[in-house]
Design a protein with these regions (language model features):
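Surface-exposed patches in mature extracellular/periplasmic domains of secreted proteins
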Residues: 56-60, 168, 267-273
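Gram-positive cell-envelope targeting signals
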Residues: 1-27
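Structured, acidic catalytic/metal-binding patches in enzyme active sites
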Residues: 176-177, 181-346
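Extracytoplasmic Gram-positive cell-surface binding/anchoring modules and repeats
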Residues: 26-78, 88-123, 134-161
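Sec-exported extracytoplasmic/periplasmic mature domains
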Residues: 49-52, 75-82, 110-117, 130-134, ...
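Short gly/ser/thr-rich secondary-structure transition/capping motifs
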Residues: 55, 170-171, 198-201
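N-terminal low-complexity, Pro/Thr/Ser-rich intrinsically disordered segments
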Residues: 28-36, 166-179
Length: 346
């Protein structure tokens, strides 16, 4: 896992894989990507952040959910609800049929909520889930419980159930959110860090409401600027025919090689990269542990996906050229010291 993250970081890939229309390079014989319906696009960011979908969602999101996928999904719901520490109850779920129909998926999700003392849970799966707005039915109001359930439908039900119960219990990560008002203008400032923990999501309703109320969302860097990220990737690597070993001491180079091996790479796997690029990457990796989100969706990336899928204007306060230029302009001595310090954990 660390090996894959290292590759992504060194390549300068900081944008989320969670936008509604990802760019896919595929063979002519590959099946067409399965795109989410318009009504589900707004649910993608939270679904991905909570692990309900992964980077490969365009290969299965419109397919009928499998029993294995449903089991994994209900496991995520169970883990999220357990964090609420709600009073438990003896759940009367005997006779509920759990299968891959819409009704079966509703029953599976209801079973997780029925273990807790929640208002309305005693009314049964359909009444409880519709009452929360988890299941909204078709235009005629039908729940279509006998129809096969797509992964997309199950994902949205699970995401809505988690958010509804977290919101009802005033739960979720609040972070550090400031609000400034001047006349008709409102500015929200949210403190973020470029990584997360697996229990960060969902964010508190106050944070999501601030996002919903915003017309423009500004970041340190535009995570959708592919040209900028490509430029940063170029700045990170040597283009003059030299390698890392030509720019740092033999002792420090040996430590870099040892770190590469510990990450499952070849000893010379970092030869193409400059000291500052490696130092930044090792610094991020040193902060990761077993609680780091496995989907690597840092708060910045979550908010970007949320905002883009909602059609909001994206802005940034810096450019990749500006930020990359600062790092690339560091003296050779400073870069070597920076890399040396970042290797303390290896």
């Amino acid at each position: 896992m660390k090996h894959n993250r290292m590759r992504r970081l060194l390549a300068g890939v900081t944008a989320a894989a969670l936008l509604a229309a990802p760019a896919l390079a595929a063979e002519d014989t590959a099946p067409a990507p399965q795109m989410p319906d318009a009504w589900a696009v707004g649910e993608l960011a939270d679904s991905y952040a909570m692990g309900l979908v992964d980077d490969n969602y365009t290969t299965y999101i419109q397919s009928t959910i499998t029993s294995e996928q449903l089991s994994a999904m209900t496991g995520i719901v169970a883990d999220k609800l357990a964090l609420l520490e709600l009073p438990q109850r003896a759940a009367d779920t005997e006779g509920l049929v759990v299968d891959t129909t819409r009704g079966g998926v509703m029953n599976a999700l209801y079973q997780e909520a029925a273990a807790y003392d929640i208002d309305g849970v005693e009314e049964g799966a359909a009444a409880f889930l519709t009452g929360l707005g988890v299941v909204r039915g078709d235009q005629a109001g039908g729940l279509n419980e006998d129809r096969p359930c797509t992964y997309q439908e199950a994902m949205v039900m699970a995401e809505r159930l988690i958010l509804a119960l977290y919101d009802a219990n005033d739960a979720g990560s609040r972070g550090l959110l400031w609000k400034a008002v001047n006349g008709d203008n409102t500015l929200y400032l949210l403190g973020t860090i470029h990584m997360d923990r697996s229990n960060v999501y969902p964010l508190h309703k106050s944070v999501r409401d601030a996002l919903d109320a915003s017309q423009v969302v500004s970041f340190e860097l535009d995570l959708n600027d592919q040209e900028g990220m490509a430029l940063l990737a170029q700045l990170q690597a040597y283009s003059d025919g030299t390698t890392l070993a030509d720019h740092i001491s033999p002792e420090l180079y040996a430590r870099v090689q040892a770190a590469a091996v510990s990450l499952g790479m070849e000893p010379n796997g970092f030869d193409a990269y400059k000291p500052w690029a490696l130092a930044s990457t090792f610094g991020v990796l040193s902060l990761q542990d077993d609680t780091t989100g496995t989907n690597a969706m840092a708060i910045d990336m979550y908010i970007n996906a949320y905002a883009v899928n909602a059609g909001k204007t994206i802005d940034s306060v810096e450019t990749y050229a500006f930020q990359g230029g600062i790092f690339d302009g560091l003296s050779a001595e400073y870069q070597e010291a920076y890399l040396d310090a970042s290797l303390a954990g290896y």
